[in-house]
Amino acid sequence: MKKNTHPNYQQVLFVDSSTGYKFVCGSTYQSDKTEVFEGQEYPVCYVSVSSASHPFFTGSKRLVDAEGRVDKFLKRYSNVKPAQPAQAAVEEAPAVKSKKKAPIKKKK
């Protein structure tokens, strides 16, 4: 087997950027930054969302206002006129005729 093909697996300190929550987990993440946590020095990985800040785990639900979204859409596109199809292009387009199938002959 080839040597040094697998990345180094080590304990890494993950820091939630939004809440400041820190936890240690095994990972192959490589970082130049290190931080002391609970008396040991770990490489640091900053994450934007963790179990401390995700709405599913915290129980805080952010409801989407469906009517507000519709109003926002109408406000944005109320001044836009719908595109009219060109009459010449519609009239010149030939109708597609269905092909007739040959009659089926019955065997005697």
UniProtKB/Swiss-Prot annotation:
GO CC, alphabetical: ribonucleoprotein complex; ribosome
InterPro entries referenced in this protein's UniProt entry, alphabetically: Ribosomal_bL28/bL31-like_sf (IPR034704), Ribosomal_bL31 (IPR002150), Ribosomal_bL31_B (IPR027493), Ribosomal_bL31_sf (IPR042105)
PROSITE patterns per UniProt: RIBOSOMAL_L31 (PS01143)
Signal peptide range in chain numbering: none
UniProt keyword list: Ribonucleoprotein, Ribosomal protein
One BP annotation, GO: translation
Region (Disordered): 88-108
GO molecular function annotations of the record: structural constituent of ribosome
UniProt keyword Signal, yes or no: no
Skewed-composition ranges (Basic residues): 97-108
Domain of life: Bacteria
Subunit structure as annotated in this protein's UniProt entry: Part of the 50S ribosomal subunit.
Family designation: Belongs to the bacterial ribosomal protein bL31 family. Type B subfamily.
PANTHER family reported in the protein's UniProt record: 50S RIBOSOMAL PROTEIN L31, CHLOROPLASTIC, LARGE RIBOSOMAL SUBUNIT PROTEIN BL31C
Protein name as catalogued: Large ribosomal subunit protein bL31B
Gene source species: Chlamydia abortus (strain DSM 27085 / S26/3) (Chlamydophila abortus)
Gene: rpmE2
